[in-house]
Design a protein with these regions (language model features):
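Hydrophobic alpha-helical segments at protein termini of multi-pass membrane proteins
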Residues: 1-293
Length: 293
């Protein structure tokens, strides 16, 4: 037993963010947020709504820890048995808990601000931004754990791989929601929720099994697949917009350039942090490994 709930919560939900880590995590959230909000082609972007869902997500995310504790202490479920036990833990434990946590801020916004939901793509953008809020908080926890390790590789590793998986798994649920609302068949929503949780769980399984590089290739492959899957879902949602206008074309080349430039910025930022902490020669080596990664 954890003693009084309040002590437990304050102890567990404490995050130590130093300026550079908060900046790194914010940079990542901003770069992906900017990239995905550019899919709003027909109706002006609703920045206030995006901000609200982001903040809600940041506030709700730390409570994941409470759910994990219930899983561990009340159900004695740690996933430390064999491979199958591991898979079950990551799908039902991790995938289930984290997808529920990311869907909640979107659900709140959809219910409270239903008037502001103008077209199908709005649901996807909210899901994406909620995932970014989740990843932002999670990145603070991870960067904090790895802080002062030999270098800041963890920043760009998490900025690309984990964030895309979080966005994909969140967005697919709301893509299922759009489909279900349009075709009046619940199977789309149910199917997408299952797909989201299983994908999330399996990605984590591959990542934690990454002693062998084979699994790492799997998880990397999942990220690439997810990135293209996201573009497909966004395109499909745009085609269903009541405000569809064939003259507003998605600026694919420009967006690809923006994405590459922003990821470059993350690398440069990592380089600066490295140089400040460990000196330039070390930073040069790290940058080289990062570029090859």
């Amino acid at each position: 037993h954890h003693g009084p709930l309040l002590t437990y919560l304050t102890f567990n939900l404490e995050l130590y963010g130093t300026w550079d880590l908060i900046l790194a995590a914010s940079l990542i959230a901003l770069l992906w947020g900017y990239y995905f909000t550019r899919f709003k082609l027909f109706v002006p972007k609703d920045y206030l709504l995006y901000f609200i869902v982001f903040i809600l997500s940041c506030l709700i995310t730390p409570f994941c820890i409470v759910l994990y504790d219930i899983l561990h202490f009340s159900f004695q479920f740690y996933g430390d048995g064999g491979f199958l036990d591991h898979v079950m833990y990551y799908i039902f434990g991790v995938g289930g808990i984290e997808e529920l946590t990311k869907a909640l801020p979107v659900l709140i916004c959809v219910l409270v601000f239903s008037k502001r939901m103008k077209e199908p793509v709005d649901y996807l953008i909210l899901a994406t931004v909620s995932a970014l809020g989740f990843a932002f908080m999670e990145n603070l926890m991870y960067f904090d754990q790895y802080y002062g390790n030999s270098n800041f590789d963890v920043i760009h590793n998490r900025s690309v791989l984990s964030v895309i998986m979080h966005i994909f798994c969140s967005t697919i649920i709301w893509y299922g929601f759009i489909k279900t609302r349009m075709l009046k068949k619940i199977k789309y929503l149910v199917g997408c929720i299952v797909l989201s949780i299983v994908t999330h769980g399996m990605y984590d399984v591959f990542l934690t099994q990454s002693v062998s590089s084979v699994f790492y290739v799997f998880s990397f492959g999942m990220v690439v697949f997810s990135f293209f899957g996201l573009k497909m879902m966004y395109n499909s949602a745009l085609n269903q917009s009541p405000f569809f206008n064939p003259n507003n074309v998605y600026p694919a080349n420009e967006n690809a350039f923006i994405l590459i430039a922003s990821l470059g910025m993350v690398l440069i930022f990592e380089f600066i942090l490295d140089a400040i902490r460990f000196g330039a020669p070390h930073a040069n080596d790290s940058l080289l490994t990062s570029l090859l990664a």
